[in-house]
Amino acid sequence: LGEAPEILAEGNEMGNKNSGGHSGGQYRPLKPEQIERIHQAALSILENIGFTYEQGLDDTLTMLEDAGAKIDHAHSRIYFPPDLILSQIANAPQQVILYSRDAQNDIDLRDDRVYMGTGGMAVTVVDIETGQARESCLQDIYNIGRIVDRLDNIHFYLRPCTAHDVPASIYDANCMYAAMQATNKHYMTGAIDRQSFRDILTLASIVAGNEKKLAEKPIFSLITCFAISPLKLCTQSTLNMQEACRHRIPVALSSAPMAGSTSPMTMAGTLAQLHAEELVGLTIGQLTHPGAPMLYGGIPGSANMRTMGYQGGAVEFGMMNAAIHQLAAHINVPNYNSSGLTDAKIPDAQAGWEKAFSSLLAAMGGSNYIHHAAGMLESMLAVAYEQYIIDDEIIGMCARVLEGIIVDDEHLAIEAIADVGPGGNYLMSPHTLAHMRSEFFAGNGITDGRFRDIWVADGSLDTRERAQEMAQKILERDPCFKLDKRTEKRIRNDFDIRM
């Protein structure tokens, strides 16, 4: 009982494999009548207040106008009749599958099924050796991908940080290469412009075998920040989104209003504005290519009214992100949202409580694709290798909550109770042995349940120090996966790869 558990980096039989896909929905912050009221408010916003736009969207505007939208070109304003919105969102698929390369980590987004993973575009990494923040680089994307590949409770890999050492013209292709060398899990990325999107489409087609195979089972998806809150279309991201829809690459429609800054101070007002923005993204995507796989991508947050910075660790962040799934479900579209953010600068106690609270709320809300759930610090400005180990444990606990309590003849254990009898104990009961590895969450080894004397003898390491050791041991091991030599050679022939 006093022995230390095998850490995940060396293989932990008690780890919970394939924890994704459990059903949430136990937490519903909005009542049905409140959901409908927000939905109607969003339709009113689009019909009467409208959207503005940047230059360079002429073809998109023509498409919208032909479909029935009213364009005020003099004031750069688009007005959307409710019938136009409702007819187009009805074309969006109710189920989106994000494929992995080994079929073991496919993500089936529908109903209340929950998957959690990375996210970001952090600009710094808290260095695992020095503990100091430094600029992130391409090697970090590879290293973090290798760590994520070993963590069973992190279900997908969304590019977590910026590669400051890669030029813009070859940026997205290099980031994709680094990620796909590191992990088989589904990869989500952004694209700087349409040429960058075409580059990553080509690179992913090489990895998948050809473009037809990629279209059948997309091994990557695209995040597009198409909406600049409040109510403004971003030209480049909108064009990228449309390009992805044409190629049937799944698209996450990222809209991230900040209450008190880029959306109303109230949660209801922020949700109404965000819902309006998402309805526009879905409408444009479905007009571009009916049936294109799309995720309702609401990421509501709030401004710290003392500093005017982003308030990632607020409890209301978890509440609003749970509500996002309800709004997406109201229009029968899978959702993408956020949890696991913190304002803490290092992996500390504050990071723990802020991350656990928002992750559990988003998961219990039934959110389908929850990014930012692993690795993030400092309100999305930083990541830390060891934080992924800690967050894998938090996500695993969330998954165990969603799994619930099984009540059947085997689990009621009447026969075991009779066999042991009054005054006995269950330590050597066959029933105990049959369920000891599955009934209670065992984790990846980061949680320390040993007696104090053993913990002291082992160096009295705190959680962060143990997580650093685990992350380093993962990186010291041989990678689980590499691109085959033929694929790698072709990629390097076609692209300027800097890693």
What are these regions (language model features)?
Residues 1-13:
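Short, Lys/Arg-enriched N-terminal segments with co-localized hydrophobic residues
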Residues 15-18, 28-41, 49-66, 386-499:
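Catalytic-core signal marking the mid-to-C-terminal active-site face
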Residues 23-27, 306-312, 340-347, 375-387:
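Short beta-alpha connecting loops at secondary-structure transitions
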Residues 35-37, 41-44, 108-130, 330-342:
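N-terminal small/glycine-rich loop or linker at the start of catalytic domains
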Residues 51-61, 73-75, 155-158, 214-217, ...:
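Flexible, glycine/charged-enriched surface loops at secondary-structure junctions
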Residues 56-58, 62-128:
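Glycine-rich, N-terminal phosphate-binding loop and its surrounding beta-alpha-beta segment
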Residues 132-364, 368:
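Helix-rich catalytic cores of soluble enzyme domains
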Residues 300, 320-343, 368-376, 383-411:
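A glycine- and small/hydrophobic-rich beta-loop-beta segment
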